[in-house]
Amino acid sequence: MDKTKALEGALSQIERAFGKGSIMRMGQRPKVETNVISTGSIGLDIALGIGGMPRGRIVEIYGPESSGKTTLALHVLAEAQKKGGTVAFIDAEHALDPGYARKLGVNIDDLLLSQPDAGEQALEIADTLVRSGAVDVLVVDSVAALVPRAELEGDMGDSHVGLHARLMSQALRKLTGTVSRSNTLVIFLNQIRMKIGVMFGNPETTTGGNALKFYSSIRLDIRRIGSIKDKDEVVGNQTRVKVVKNKMAPPFRQVEFDIMYGEGISKMGELLDLGVKGNIVEKSGAWFSFDSQRIGQGRENAKQFLREHPEMASEIERRIRAEAGVLSDALMTDPEPDADGTPED
């Protein structure tokens, strides 16, 4: 039998059974430009290589406690709302601070919030929201707090080996197809644990088994690397984000920015740092200059000057975005072990 006829027969049979478009040649597939949502950080948008977080994909953000995971996720929600999107937050940790979210630019009145009792309930709500196709961004905070119902109903000393990992694996198998079809960005926040008895390599691992590592298109490792002080008072954290996995662009880029208390990611700080990296802003000693005009002695003074002169800040931002290709190469780092002690694939 002729192979071409056999193939056409098989294709038409598949289309009759599963609907038009269920199978097609790659060349026939409509080319869709990656639709992204900004992270709220110019540097991280550049480091991701596509200008933000991709819709229709699963993203994992992990790191130690108080490293900025929820802050980064809330910035993404705020950016999606600015574009007129619908956003949801599944607060499994029951720890969302509405006042802080509002300060970061999130419209609390339109935010869909769920505080589920058990892991199964949280993931069922997530699946229903994604299937609706009406939600643009969904954040689950956090994987570690998705406690299986059997564990909640059992006694304190009971052993529940592998229940959490099985729950995550099952949920992600269901979610991954609907996430792609509905074009929803799903962000899982995750915590770090230490593996016992690791002599060599990185003892850190993330909770919830291995499924999320495989299903995530992007994995971000976020760490607090220092404190920002105003005289003796701590007013913020210096934060480093490393792209440990990226299916959309080259991984292993990292970016540093300031997270200021009550303000979130410091845009002015990023403009200075990226401006210096891209030779857009000149730094001579402690002085910062732009187009031969001095803008401040010391980083905090220069940041304040840019806040007071938004037209200059927007011009620096425009030039930084124009130099995104050059800057993304400057953000490249060597592959390092991720939270499992192995380089990401």
From Swiss-Prot:
PROSITE patterns: RECA_1, RECA_2, RECA_3. SMART domains: AAA. SUPFAM superfamilies: P-loop containing nucleoside triphosphate hydrolases, RecA protein, C-terminal domain. ATP binds at residues 63-70. Keywords: ATP-binding, Cytoplasm, DNA damage, DNA recombination, DNA repair, DNA-binding, Nucleotide-binding, SOS response. Residues 335-345 have a biased composition (Acidic residues). It is found in: Cytoplasm. One of its GO terms (cellular component) is cytosol. The keyword S-adenosyl-L-methionine does not apply. Residues 326-345 are annotated as: Disordered. One of its GO terms (molecular function) is damaged DNA binding. One of its GO terms (biological process) is DNA repair. Pfam families: RecA (PF00154), RecA_C (PF21096). Can catalyze the hydrolysis of ATP in the presence of single-stranded DNA, the ATP-dependent uptake of single-stranded DNA by duplex DNA, and the ATP-dependent hybridization of homologous single-stranded DNAs. It interacts with LexA causing its activation and leading to its autocatalytic cleavage. Belongs to the RecA family. HAMAP family: RecA. This is Protein RecA. It comes from Gluconobacter oxydans (strain 621H) (Gluconobacter suboxydans).
